[in-house]
């Protein structure tokens, strides 16, 4: 949580850094309310985009990935759909360069719009420093899902994406990094395309 105060204003770009580097849930809600008119309006757009890019087993209720349920189901996805979303973000999106710039930034500092409060974000994606060719990724955690990660690597013309769900619960937050490294190494060694 970024710890925004009521009526505070921010630039969208700064909120995107807070969301993607710190996983600040309040930044996700603020973006959703401004871009979609409401959380519900934004998640409707998220669900439409997910279907458009081929995600058939994903249903978003929250803009931040937190556990939720409504009359239509539970907030859920699959490892395959998360990989498909990351593929879109790094290979197909018209904003792919912006996405990569944000998700690869080691840290980011910004002020609120009125310049009365400064905020600091730190990239928690340890995979970026683990392997040559590590491109990007996003961490996540909920009580139901455990630690999750989706990451990409580019090496010798190959782009590999690893998606991990339920990869440990506290005190095992580091499992995802070793599992990602092993899967990426396996893919580089054994996968041809």
Feature roles, as predicted:
Residues 55-56, 73-193:
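Domain-terminus/edge residues, biased toward the C-terminal soluble/receptor-binding domains
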Residues 1-80, 90-92:
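Active-site-adjacent loops and short helices of periplasmic peptidoglycan-processing enzymes
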């Amino acid at each position: 949580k970024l710890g925004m105060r009521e009526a505070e204003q921010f630039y969208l770009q700064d909120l995107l850094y807070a969301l993607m580097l710190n996983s600040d849930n309040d930044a996700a809600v603020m973006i959703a309310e401004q871009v979609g008119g409401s959380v519900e309006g934004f998640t409707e757009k998220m669900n439409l985009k997910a279907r458009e890019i081929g995600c058939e087993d994903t249903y978003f209720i929250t803009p931040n990935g937190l556990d939720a349920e409504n009359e239509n189901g539970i907030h859920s996805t699959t490892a395959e759909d998360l990989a498909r979303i990351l593929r879109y973000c790094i290979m197909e999106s018209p904003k792919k360069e912006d996405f990569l710039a944000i998700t690869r930034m080691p840290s980011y500092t910004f002020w609120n719009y009125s310049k009365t409060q400064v905020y600091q974000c730190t990239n928690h994606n340890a995979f970026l420093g683990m392997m040559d060719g590590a491109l990007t990724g996003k961490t996540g955690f909920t009580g139901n899902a455990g630690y999750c990660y989706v990451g990409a690597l580019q090496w010798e013309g190959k782009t590999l994406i690893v998606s991990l769900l339920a990869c440990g619960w506290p005190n095992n937050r580091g499992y995802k990094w070793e599992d990602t490294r092993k899967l990426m190494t396996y893919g580089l060694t054994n996968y041809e395309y």
